[in-house]
């Protein structure tokens, strides 16, 4: 099987959806017999310090040109100098960074330009949902033929859950406007 590398900044054991997704993807590829090296990048992404960006570029440039390189979304979205990487790159984009709330207009414009350029640079893009694919196509001009949707999975419980009275709904996710908790609460209020 073709060996690959996966560039992930920060601590892979961080308990966020993105890190859990990437940790499971890395483990799943290895379980299928793929030789996937984990490139451990500095934790400052998506706002890399010059030192972290320099170290990341050195690690990524060391990946041979016959070994695909998967880029975490923080790296694909905020990384500069990626055109110097010889390996064919695949971007793993959970949500485009330029579309986060609370960014200054200058920061949003910078991320938009960087993400757009890097999406055009990579050979392929992995996304967790049709919504992310559609956003990349509409806003960044990404070619939908170069995008694969890899939805996150869940571990099924060993036993069926005990019935609750009244029924309970568990919504898992950071409390963030794009997660749609307001939509859920509005629907439940009806």
Describe the role of every protein-language-model region.
Residues 17-24, 110, 183, 187:
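Conserved alpha-helical elements of sugar-nucleotide-dependent glycosyltransferases
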Residues 97, 106-127:
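Membrane-proximal helix-turn-helix segments that form the acceptor-binding/catalytic region
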Residues 42-60:
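N-terminal beta-loop-helix "entrance" segment that forms/cooperates
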Residues 71-76:
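Short His-centered aromatic/hydrophobic patch
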Residues 126, 161-179, 185-189:
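Conserved donor-binding/catalytic core segment of Leloir-type glycosyltransferases
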